[in-house]
């Protein structure tokens, strides 16, 4: 679980293990923001969860402000290429991918508020994807689970752009188990019950 909580280490293991992930750079508190960052981008605290310490930025000024806010959560951050497209989650239990769920926030992006407020997103499970894309995303979810050495269950978050290229954003080894949480919804489609 510790590996998957460190987003920088997770990204490195994804790249080494053949799991597509958005391009990103790691910064430690006190390091200068490089000039060559492309915008829009996403700034993330390396060890945050529930989308806390995650900021969408459109330019350098917004990025500087987001870095200051993200450093309140962690001394290490990632600045990641923003992937415009559809958002998905794939639960994996004991190495086997569950049906994919698509998350469409009614407004904004899937942040802390949208994660825990019923009715703030439209969630479709199983996601409306053709069989080849479904198998590809489930394969990458299982591969991500494997390269991070997860042994029980996890939720892998993906973005897919308009060219149907998919990118694994991160793994969550402590996924929510509330009635609005994603992993229990995916598992229910397969007949699992966590009550």
Feature roles, as predicted:
Residues 1-3, 107-108:
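Short gly/pro/ser/thr-enriched loop/turn and capping motifs at secondary-structure boundaries
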Residues 140-144:
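Short, well-ordered amphipathic alpha-helical segments that serve as non-catalytic structural scaffolds
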Residues 81, 92, 145-177, 187:
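Conserved metal-phosphate-binding beta-hairpin within the catalytic cores
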Residues 51, 106, 172-186:
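Glycine-rich phosphate/pyrophosphate-binding beta-alpha loops
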Residues 58-139, 160-167:
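Phosphate-binding site of ATP-dependent enzymes
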Residues 1, 22, 191-195:
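Short, intrinsically disordered, charge-balanced linker/junction segments flanking boundaries
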Residues 2-86:
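Active-site nucleotide/adenylate-binding loops and adjacent lid/helix of ATP-dependent enzymes
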């Amino acid at each position: 679980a510790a590996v998957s909580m460190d987003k920088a280490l997770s990204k490195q293991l994804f790249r080494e293990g053949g799991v597509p992930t958005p391009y990103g750079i790691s910064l430690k508190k006190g390091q200068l923001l490089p000039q060559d960052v492309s915008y829009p981008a996403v700034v993330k605290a390396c060890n945050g969860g529930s989308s806390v310490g995650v900021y969408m930025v459109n330019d350098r000024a917004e990025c500087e402000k987001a870095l200051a806010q993200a450093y309140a959560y962690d001394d290490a951050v990632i600045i990641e290429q923003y992937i415009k497209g559809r958002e998905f989650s794939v639960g994996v239990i004991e190495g086997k991918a569950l049906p994919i769920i698509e998350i469409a926030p009614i407004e904004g992006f899937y942040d802390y508020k949208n994660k825990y407020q019923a009715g703030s997103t439209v969630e479709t499970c199983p996601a409306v994807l053709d069989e080849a894309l479904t198998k590809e995303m489930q394969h990458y979810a299982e591969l991500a689970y494997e390269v991070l050495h997860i042994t029980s269950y996890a939720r892998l978050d993906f973005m897919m752009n308009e060219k149907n290229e998919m990118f694994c954003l991160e793994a969550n080894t402590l996924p929510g188990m509330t009635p609005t949480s994603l992993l229990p919804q995916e598992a229910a489609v397969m007949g699992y019950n966590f009550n």
